[in-house]
Structure formats: structure tokens, C-alpha cells
């Protein structure tokens, strides 16, 4: 016999209205969203790799986001089940944008980053949710140089 489960609400926020949803149609806008929302999440740790998903509607406006996984200094476990779960649950999500940080500051993608991107693109194709990009965020540089990498711009998201 199944016993009743008790759940604790960790974070609750009202869904934005269409007028409040931010447009996210470039890597720069995604990184701006990362810096204003994801890094302020209570579980975000800049000393560990953290993987987040931005949930987008058909007009590329952000319906919400989810911090999917928190790893170690240089490793992260990401599974399609967790990546797409919230997108399926809330509905109205036609695409997602993958993002994670590299605590080392170097935003260059690793072989593992490229592989997980390809795996998640294939999973998204099965359920008709597009994976638009995977953006790796490094550390800001004093000279203001670009401190992130877009795997789409690098040719890995096709």
C-alpha cells in the first residue's frame, strides 16, 4: 500500500503574462537573463557547474526557467528526463535553450558538452521541442571580451 507523500515547496513564482515575458532571440539576451535570474537562484553555486534550461514559447519569449543540475568544479550530470520535464508540464513551450557555466572561466565547450547537446537535440526532436542553443557562460573579463560560447554559433546545434 502506498503511503501519502509529503512535499516541500522550495520556490514558487507567478508565471509571467505574455506582456511580461522577455524576448530571448540571441545568445547575448540569454546570457543577460542568466546573469539577472539564474545566478540569483538560491541553489546556484558559481564554484560548481550549474545547468539551467530556459523555456520559450513560439515567439521566443521566456515562459520560465529551471535549474536542472548542480555538479562539481568540472563535471555535471544531465539527463533528458529532467531537462524536458518542466517544459512538458507547464505546456506552451515550443523550444528550450540550454545553459551552463564553467567555473574555470573558460567558456570553450568540452567534448562532453558537445555530446550532451547532441543527445538533448535528439531527445527534443522526439517530443517536438526544439533545442535552439546551448550556451556556456564563463567569467567576465576586464577588457569586456565575450565571456560565453554559443554552440549554435560554433556549428554544433543543427
Where are these regions (language model features)?
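A generic structural signal for ordered alpha-helices
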Residues: 8, 12, 31-34, 38, ...
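A short, structure-level motif marking secondary-structure boundaries and short turns
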Residues: 41-42, 68-70, 104-106
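Histidine/lysine/aspartate-rich catalytic loop segments that bind and position anionic ligands
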Residues: 49-89
